[in-house]
Swiss-Prot record:
Underlying gene: Uncx
Protein name stated in the entry: Homeobox protein unc-4 homolog
Low complexity: bias regions: 228-240, 420-430, 455-476
Compositionally biased residues, Pro residues: 248-257, 275-284, 407-419, 481-504
Tissues expressing the protein: Expressed in a narrow layer adjacent to the ventricular zone of the dorsal spinal cord, preceding overt neuronal differentiation.
UniProt DNA-binding region: 109-168
Length: 530
C-alpha cells in the first residue's frame, strides 16, 4: 500500500531513487521516467520544502524528493543503480490509488472505497469519544498515526457524527427497546444512575405540585361560591380530613369521634353539604352566645384551625343535634341562600342598625324568633319576617281587632311611644286624607318629620270632636266613647283635615289598646298611658 502510494505521487518520476530507498522490487525502464518542465521543477522544490515537516503527510510521502531533485538533470545513470536489474524492462501501471489529491494531467481517476482495519477503527472511535468535531491538526495527526489520508479521516468523522445523530433521534418502537435506551448527556456520554433517579424524582414532584395546585384552585372556587359552602364546606373538609389538598380523592366523612366537637362540627364536616337543613333553626352565628350558654358549654365545641370564631359557633336551637344526621339539602337551595345572610347583619350594634335603617332590632330577634319561627316557618328560617311576628303574637293574645300587615317595617330600637302617638296630629292633612290607613299601619314613617309637641291620644280625639263628627260618622263607629280632657292641647299644625287619621276605627275607644300596641314592639308604655 505504501509502495503504490509512493509511485502514485505527483513526483513519481523520481520513482527510481524512491524505489532504492524502500526496496521496490519491480525494475523501472526509461519509459517510466518523464522529462520535467519548469513548473514540475518548482513543484519538486516545494515538495522538498514540505519534507522539512517530519510528521506531516506530505513530508512523509516526499521525504526523498530533495535528494532526487539533484539527479533529475541526468536520469539515465540513476536508473541502473536504482533499479538493480537494468536489462529487464517490465511495464508497470501507475494508476489504482486511493488518493483523491492526485494531480494527473490525464483524465480523473475513480477513487476506490477505503477499507479500515480493526485497529484503525478502534483508534478512530477513541478519538470520536474524546471529541465529535476534531480540528485539522488533530485529523492530520490521526492520519499520520493511522497511515491514512487526512481527507479520509475527515470523511470518517462526518459519517460517524451522522450515525450518532440517527441513533440519538431513534424512538422506541412497539415491543422493542430503543437504540438509546440508556439516557445520555448532550455530549453522548452515559448518564449517572443517581442523576437519572434525581430527574425522575423531580418529574414526580412537579406532577404532584401541579395536582395540588389544581385541588387548591377547586377548593377556592368552592369557597368563593355564593351559598352555604362559603362558611362551612371547604375549611371543615381541610380540618376533618387532615390531609387537605394532598389527597387526590375527595375527602371522606369525619369519623364518629368528630361528634365530640359539637353539632356544628358534625353537621358541617362533610364537604359539599348544605349547612342548614329544612327543619333546623337559624344558621350558626345568628344567635348571641348569651342567649344559649347551656348549649355552648354542654356541647364543648372547640374552635377549629383555619376557621373564624364567628363561624365556629354551634347552631342555636334544640333541634340541631337531632337534625345533624339527616341528609343535607342542596347548598344552592333557597334555604341555604337565605340563611347565609343573617350573620353579617347580626354583628351590627343597636345604634348602627338604627342609622343604617335595618329592619330589625339586633338585641331582640334571637329568643322570640326561634319560638315563632318554629310555629310558622319551619322550612324558611328567615330573619326579617320574624321581627314583625312578635307584635302579631301580642295582638292575637290581646283585644286588638286588626293585625299589622307583613309589609310594614317594625319600629326602630329607641322607645318611640310619645312621638308615635303625637304623630297622628303632626302628619300633614292632605297625605293623611289620601291614605289614612298608611298613618295607622306605619307610625314610625309618620313620626319621621321630627319629634312634635307631646300630646296624648285622647287630646287628639278631643280635637276630632271639636272639628266635627262627620269623619266619625263616615267610619261608622261610636266616637263619643273618648271623653276629651280640656287642659291638653293638640299639636301646632293640625290643619282643617288633621282629624282624618283619628277618624278611622283606630281612634275609637274599643280599638285604643290595639292601635297602641301596633305602633311599636314594646307594649308596656302604651299600657301605662291608658
Amino acid at each position: 500500500m505504501m509502495d503504490g502510494r509512493l509511485l502514485e505521487h505527483p513526483h513519481a518520476q523520481f520513482g527510481g531513487s524512491l524505489g532504492g530507498v524502500v526496496g521496490f522490487p519491480y525494475p523501472l525502464g526509461h519509459h517510466h521516467v518523464y522529462e520535467l518542465a519548469g513548473h514540475q521543477l518548482q513543484s519538486a522544490a516545494a515538495a522538498a520544502a514540505a519534507a522539512s515537516v517530519p510528521f506531516s503527510i506530505d513530508g512523509l510521502l516526499s521525504g526523498s524528493c530533495a535528494a532526487a531533485a539533484a539527479s533529475v538533470v541526468n536520469p539515465t545513470p540513476l536508473l541502473p543503480a536504482a533499479c538493480g536489474v537494468a536489462g529487464e524492462s517490465q511495464p508497470f501501471k501507475l494508476a489504482d490509488s486511493g488518493d483523491p489529491d492526485k494531480e494527473s494531467p490525464g483524465c480523473k481517476r475513480r477513487r476506490t472505497r477505503t477499507n479500515f482495519t480493526g485497529w484503525q477503527l478502534e483508534e478512530l472511535e477513541k478519538a470520536f469519544n474524546e471529541s465529535h468535531y476534531p480540528d485539522v491538526f488533530m485529523r492530520e495527526a490521526l492520519a499520520v498515526r493511522l497511515d491514512l489520508v487526512e481527507s479520509r479521516v475527515q470523511v470518517w468523522f462526518q459519517n460517524r457524527r451522522a450515525k450518532w445523530r440517527k441513533k440519538e433521534n431513534t424512538k422506541k418502537g412497539p415491543g422493542r427497546p430503543a437504540h438509546n435506551s440508556h439516557p445520555t448527556t448532550c455530549s453522548g456520554e452515559p448518564m449517572d444512575p443517581e442523576e437519572i433517579a434525581r430527574k425522575e424524582l423531580e418529574k414526580m414532584e412537579k406532577k404532584k405540585r401541579k395536582h395540588e395546585k389544581k385541588l387548591l384552585k377547586s377548593q377556592s372556587r368552592h369557597l368563593h361560591s355564593p351559598g352555604g359552602l362559603s362558611l362551612h364546606s371547604a375549611p371543615s373538609s381541610d380540618s376533618d380530613s387532615g390531609g387537605g389538598g394532598l389527597s387526590p380523592e375527595p375527602p371522606e366523612p369525619p369519623p364518629p369521634t368528630a361528634s365530640a366537637k359539637g353539632p356544628g362540627a358534625h353537621g358541617s364536616g362533610i364537604a359539599g353539604s348544605a349547612p342548614v337543613p329544612p327543619g333546623e333553626p337559624p344558621a350558626p352565628g345568628t344567635c348571641d352566645p348569651a342567649f344559649y350558654p347551656s348549649q355552648r358549654s354542654g356541647a364543648g365545641s372547640q374552635p377549629r384551625l383555619g376557621r373564624p370564631a364567628d363561624k365556629d359557633t354551634v347552631p342555636c336551637g334544640p333541634g340541631a343535634a337531632s337534625t345533624a344526621g339527616l341528609p343535607k339539602a342542596s347548598p344552592f337551595s333557597v334555604e341555604s341562600l337565605l340563611s347565609d345572610s343573617p350573620p353579617r347583619r347580626k354583628a351590627t350594634p343597636a345604634n348602627t342598625a338604627a342609622t343604617a335603617g335595618l329592619d330589625f332590632t339586633p338585641g331582640l330577634p334571637c329568643a322570640p324568633r326561634t319560638l315563632i319561627g318554629k310555629g310558622h316557618f319551619l322550612l324558611y328560617p328567615i330573619t326579617q319576617p320574624l321581627g314583625f311576628l312578635v307584635p302579631q303574637a301580642a295582638l292575637k293574645g290581646g283585644a286588638g281587632p286588626e293585625l299589622v300587615p307583613k309589609d310594614a317595617p317594625p319600629a326602630p330600637p329607641a322607645p318611640p311611644a310619645p312621638p308615635a302617638q303625637a304623630s297622628f296630629g303632626a302628619f300633614p292633612g292632605p297625605v293623611g286624607a289620601a291614605d289614612p290607613a298608611f298613618a295607622r299601619r306605619s307610625p314610625e314613617v309618620v313620626a319621621s318629620p321630627g319629634p312634635p309637641a307631646p300630646a296624648s291620644f285622647r287630646g287628639l280625639a278631643a280635637a276630632a270632636a271639636e272639628s266635627g263628627a262627620g269623619d266619625c260618622a263616615d267610619a261608622g263607629t261610636v266616637c263619643p266613647a273618648a271623653p276629651p280632657p280640656p287642659p291638653l292641647e293638640t299639636s301646632p299644625g293640625p290643619g282643617p283635615r288633621a282629624p282624618s287619621p283619628p277618624g278611622e276605627p283606630a281612634t275609637c275607644g274599643a280599638a285604643e289598646p290595639g292601635a297602641a300596641t301596633g305602633s311599636s314592639p314594646p307594649e308596656g308604655e302604651e299600657v301605662d298611658m291608658d
